[in-house]
């Protein structure tokens, strides 16, 4: 009897990549009956799904590939593939530098992966396809297969904002939205498998625009309204959004649709209008704060998290202090902050940068300390409250406890029976720790 082939997938970066990796697995399971393995040494196929947002992304990929080279020498039939945004950037140069790589594919061509693997096996020639065939990939993917009550659902690809620091438009292409009815179909398929919470994904997810079957123009607000009508779907999230796409209709969803969670990740990047202009964000601090005010009017308990870039070229101490002020004024929940690192080929990479690495690190530490204090204060304010929690798994810290997620995206650990996994329960919060909560079933 032939044993099923095994696949090892290493995923870097964002939730879009996590979604794409799950769809790669769906395809190869459908095509070849593959099973996953956590051990690359026993794999028949090794895939790296890469991210190019952070510094030295390419070198990290080649470092991992170098570890797999001896496995290829030992087993010439092993298939090694590189996908994702680094694949889009590097293309043929990946094979030139690492000739043992068999397939290179971009985010928009992952649906061709089974055919590319078959072509490599048949011809012995490495296959490279990093084209941008819009949403063709969604037409060729099998129905999703999920385990657990929470799932990702990709609704659009790419970004057309062209912020000066960002490589995404060059690696994932311009914005392309999936057909409205296709998204509803996938959501229903997920619900039929027991999914209760969906997270809608896109690089600029609230820029979603498509048409319904009757020709009505649909945006993210309308999509959320329709998804909320699926009885089994009890909770809806979306990420990542752009402030300029927070339309009145979308903000109004927070007042009308309880299934839409009381948490929003809304990247601001900086608190200085001058820096925002140089980043080509196309909004001001005042406009951003106005959006937050409207969101809190619609949903008073909403938690707002964000992204911040520290040390952008030309950032002065005054600019940075403006970012600190914005952090305090908005009261951001736990957020992501990074020192600026130039992405090759982006406009910002050509800007003069006279801020020392030491000063950038100092600014980052100050910003993160403030944000940490604010996040902890929000957690502390939840002690004594009763939260609706979707139980996801056994706790990573204690085998006799469960772990779940609140509406506002907090992890809660509490004693409970494993039979409750994938269910919603009410939990009284008893303690706020550094980045998690403790509680008890009500």
Curated annotation (Swiss-Prot):
Cofactor note text: Binds 2 [4Fe-4S] clusters. One cluster is coordinated with 3 cysteines and an exchangeable S-adenosyl-L-methionine.
Cofactor: [4Fe-4S] cluster
Main location: cytoplasm
Keywords: 4Fe-4S, Cytoplasm, Iron, Iron-sulfur, Metal-binding, S-adenosyl-L-methionine, Transferase, tRNA processing
Gene Ontology CC: one annotated term: cytosol
Domain MTTase N-terminal, chain residue ranges per copy: 5-122
Enzyme superclass (EC): transferase
GO MF terms, alphabetically ordered: 4 iron, 4 sulfur cluster binding; metal ion binding; N6-isopentenyladenosine methylthiotransferase activity
Domain Radical SAM core as annotated: residue spans: 145-377
Domain (TRAM) ranges: 380-442
Classification via Gene3D superfamilies: Methylthiotransferase, N-terminal domain, tm_1862 like domain
Compartments it resides in: Cytoplasm
Catalytic activity: N(6)-dimethylallyladenosine(37) in tRNA + (sulfur carrier)-SH + AH2 + 2 S-adenosyl-L-methionine = 2-methylsulfanyl-N(6)-dimethylallyladenosine(37) in tRNA + (sulfur carrier)-H + 5'-deoxyadenosine + L-methionine + A + S-adenosyl-L-homocysteine + 2 H(+)
Enzyme Commission code: 2.8.4.3
Similarity-based family: Belongs to the methylthiotransferase family. MiaB subfamily.
Subunit structure: Monomer.
Protein's UniProt name: tRNA-2-methylthio-N(6)-dimethylallyladenosine synthase
Gene: miaB
């Amino acid at each position: 009897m032939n044993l099923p082939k095994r696949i090892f997938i290493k995923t870097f970066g964002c939730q879009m990549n996590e979604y794409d990796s799950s769809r790669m697995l769906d395809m190869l399971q459908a095509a070849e009956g593959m099973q996953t393995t956590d051990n690359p040494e026993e794999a028949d196929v090794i895939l790296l799904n890469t991210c190019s947002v952070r510094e030295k992304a390419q070198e990290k990929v080649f470092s991992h590939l170098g570890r797999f080279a001896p496995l290829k020498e030992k087993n010439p039939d092993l298939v090694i593939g590189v996908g994702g945004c680094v694949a889009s950037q590097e293309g043929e140069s990946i094979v030139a530098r690492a000739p043992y790589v068999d397939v290179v594919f971009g985010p928009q061509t992952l649906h061709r992966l089974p055919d590319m693997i078959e072509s490599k096996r048949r011809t012995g020639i490495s296959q490279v396809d990093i084209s941008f065939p819009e949403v063709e990939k969604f037409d060729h993917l099998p129905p999703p297969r999920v385990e657990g009550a929470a799932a990702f659902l990709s609704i659009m690809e790419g970004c057309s904002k062209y912020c000066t620091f960002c490589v995404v438009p060059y690696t994932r292409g311009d914005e392309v939205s999936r057909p409205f009815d296709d998204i509803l179909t996938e959501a229903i398929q997920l619900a039929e498998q027991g999914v209760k919470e969906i997270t809608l994904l896109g690089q600029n997810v609230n820029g979603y625009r498509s048409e319904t079957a009757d020709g009505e123009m649909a945006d993210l607000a309308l999509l959320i309204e329709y998804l909320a009508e699926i009885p089994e779907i009890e909770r809806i999230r979306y990420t990542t959004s752009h402030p300029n796409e927070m339309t009145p209709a979308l903000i109004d969803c927070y007042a009308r649709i309880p299934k839409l969670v009381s948490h929003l990740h809304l990247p601001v990047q900086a608190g200085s209008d001058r820096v925002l202009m140089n980043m080509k964000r196309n909004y001001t601090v005042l406009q951003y704060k106005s959006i937050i005010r409207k969101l809190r009017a619609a949903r008073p308990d909403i938690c707002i998290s964000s992204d911040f870039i520290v040390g952008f070229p030309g950032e002065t101490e005054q600019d940075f202090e403006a970012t600190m002020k914005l952090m305090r004024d908005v009261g951001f929940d736990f957020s992501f902050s990074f020192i600026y690192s130039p992405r090759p080929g982006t406009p910002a990479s050509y800007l003069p940068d006279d801020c020392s690495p030491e000063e950038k690190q100092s600014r980052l530490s100050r910003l993160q300390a403030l944000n940490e204090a604010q996040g902890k204060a929000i957690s502390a304010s939840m002690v004594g409250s009763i939260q609706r929690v979707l139980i996801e798994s056994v706790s990573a810290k204690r085998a006799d406890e469960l772990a779940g997620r609140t509406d506002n995206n907090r992890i809660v650990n509490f004693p409970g029976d494993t039979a409750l996994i994938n269910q919603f329960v009410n939990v009284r919060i008893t303690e706020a720790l550094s980045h998690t909560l403790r509680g008890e079933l009500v």
